[in-house]
Amino acid sequence: MSKKYYIVSGEASGDLHGSNLMKAILKKEPDAEFRFWGGDLMKEVGGTLVKHYKDLAFMGFLEVVLNLKTILRNIKFCKEDIKKYRPDVLILVDYPGFNLRIAKFAKSLGIKVVYYISPQLWAWKEGRVETIKKYVDEMLVILPFEEDFYKKHSVKAHFVGHPLLDAISNLNPIDSQEFKKQNNLDSREIIALLPGSRKQ
């Protein structure tokens, strides 16, 4: 019987990382079924897209306050959808403000909860580790020291490598001189500006 996975990802970066995770699961479990909140990359892998992250990404205090009713409606809808689908495993990808609430609900239903890409508790809100300990069965962490951090707090954790390494490994490297030529750049140094994970 195929295993049912419900995945919640609320940002563009989570869509990328969630899609790579889905591909990895399918390599081990070709019959795995997916139902998810994510984006186009996850949809390409296959399964049922319930909500697109573009409907979920609210940034900044004011935007969150102005959209609080929508956020609460989304949390309620997500809980109802999980209850109907009854997955074998719930995988939460980053997005802690939303996902920790979903973890608590899923745990109350006896669903296995896996959290992929840890909230940066070691940098802020270390107290949240108690919430994770209570409602998350397993952490899949992307920074080597996070595994020790969680184990110190008696949380099952596995270092799985950084997903951006997967993303860049799919790119074909280009020679710097060729890049400058293609983009009409002179020989001066290039400074890269790398925006965050949310599309605006």
Predicted regions and their residues:
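Active-site and donor-binding regions of nucleotide-sugar-utilizing enzymes
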Residues: 3-185, 193-200
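Internal, well-ordered alpha/beta segment that forms a basic, Gly-enriched binding/recognition surface
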Residues: 189
